[in-house]
């Protein structure tokens, strides 16, 4: 919906200055991985936290980022609450796994280039 206070060109420019973060498979799907929030739009330089609840009894969590028109990029993984592998995760991002095995991906100082699909997976 367009803002009545801004001409179309100004609205488009303002929209381009926002960062859109989406999670694949957000919500509950037949006892699979649960991710939240489903989608998120933030301003540049803001922070965001994405949550991943693994399949019950799975103790390993993997985070991925997929930018527009790109292949998924591995960010980081955890096994039994410890970081087990690190991929191309920006310094502005951090992640952790908690005692109930859910994980959070924290992103600070968001940039337009962070606009992407974020998803997590779990395994035994």
Swiss-Prot record:
InterPro entries: Ig-like_dom, Ig-like_dom_sf, Ig-like_fold, Ig_V-set, TCR_beta_variable
Record flagged with keyword Phosphoprotein: no
Intracellular or extracellular location(s): Cell membrane
Domain Ig-like: 32-124
Top-level taxon: Eukaryota
Alphabetical list of Gene3D superfamilies matching this protein: Immunoglobulins
Cysteine disulfide partners in this protein: 52-120
Gene Ontology cellular-component terms listed: plasma membrane; T cell receptor complex
Signal peptide: 1-31
Alphabetically ordered keywords of this record: Adaptive immunity, Cell membrane, Disulfide bond, Glycoprotein, Immunity, Immunoglobulin domain, Membrane, Receptor, Signal, T cell receptor
Glycan attachment residues as annotated in the record: 106
Protein's GO biological process: adaptive immune response; cell surface receptor signaling pathway
Protein function: V region of the variable domain of T cell receptor (TR) beta chain that participates in the antigen recognition. Alpha-beta T cell receptors are antigen specific receptors which are essential to the immune response and are present on the cell surface of T lymphocytes. Recognize peptide-major histocompatibility (MH) (pMH) complexes that are displayed by antigen presenting cells (APC), a prerequisite for efficient T cell adaptive immunity against pathogens.
Self-association state and partner proteins as the record states: Alpha-beta TR is a heterodimer composed of an alpha and beta chain; disulfide-linked. The alpha-beta TR is associated with the transmembrane signaling CD3 coreceptor proteins to form the TR-CD3 (TcR or TCR). The assembly of alpha-beta TR heterodimers with CD3 occurs in the endoplasmic reticulum where a single alpha-beta TR heterodimer associates with one CD3D-CD3E heterodimer, one CD3G-CD3E heterodimer and one CD247 homodimer forming a stable octameric structure. CD3D-CD3E and CD3G-CD3E heterodimers preferentially associate with TR alpha and TR beta chains, respectively.
Protein name from the UniProt record: T cell receptor beta variable 13
Record organism: Homo sapiens (Human)
Record lineage: Eukaryota, Metazoa, Chordata, Craniata, Vertebrata
């Amino acid at each position: 919906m367009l803002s009545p206070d801004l001409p179309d060109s100004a609205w488009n420019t303002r929209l381009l200055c926002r960062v859109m973060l989406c999670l694949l498979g957000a919500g509950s799907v037949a006892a699979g991985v649960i991710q939240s929030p489903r989608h998120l739009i933030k301003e540049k330089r803001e922070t965001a936290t994405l949550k991943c609840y693994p399949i019950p009894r799975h103790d390993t969590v993997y985070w991925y980022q997929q930018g527009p028109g790109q292949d998924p990029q591995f960010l980081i993984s955890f096994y039994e609450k410890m970081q087990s592998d690190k991929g191309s995760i920006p310094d502005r991002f951090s992640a952790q796994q908690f005692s109930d095995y859910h994980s959070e991906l924290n992103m600070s100082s968001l940039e337009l280039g962070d606009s992407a699909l974020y998803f997590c997976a779990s395994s035994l």
